């Protein structure tokens, strides 16, 4: 269950109520100016129980951003209205708090497994097909923390009528020109004794080519999208 929070800049002095108790909202810090310059807009902020451990709930305080400029460009040209790229940053909190002497590293394996499963499920809920988990690697954040980075592969096929993809029609296999390979990334790390999750997804092919339109706003490809997303992930704290 999600507990919506009014969109606001990097503030941590808000609260939400759950089961009669008032809890602080501890949103992660994100590079606001970089996001604004890149055409990203804040889609929502939520605080929700992401999953439960035997003795506690794990609450996720999340900021979700979408590439509004890319979405508008596609909508203007072909009438398909959906987010094509997204980026999120999450700070996890435990309710009740971890007991004295037990740090986040002691539950890292469990949290990591659940986070990876949840991210794959989220990609599927967004209409992406054939979601699969790929390789794992390491990366350094801008604060010097070491993060685990996992790649996800998926696909999306725009419906010519403007609806969601189904991936079940004839001619919609991975070799079909209108099928868009999608890449997702999920990073997990510990910063200042608290878990951070960050990630997102983007099309692997230029949307101008896939949608057969001439528009420089749709010309960017995977290298540009990949580097921008990974830079945003590194900047989360």
Say what each PLM segment does.
Residues 182-206:
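Extended hydrophobic
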Residues 1-35, 237:
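Secretory targeting signatures
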Residues 32-47, 229-237:
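Short conserved aromatic/hydrophobic patches within beta-strands of well-structured domains
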Residues 38-111, 145, 170:
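Secretory pathway targeting signatures of secreted, lumenal, and periplasmic proteins
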Residues 197-237:
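Surface-exposed amphipathic alpha-helical segments
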Residues 36-52, 125-139:
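Short secondary-structure junctions
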Residues 3, 22-23, 27, 89, ...:
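A composition-biased, non-transmembrane "mature-region" signal
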Residues 115-185:
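Signature of long, low-cysteine stretches enriched in small and polar/charged residues
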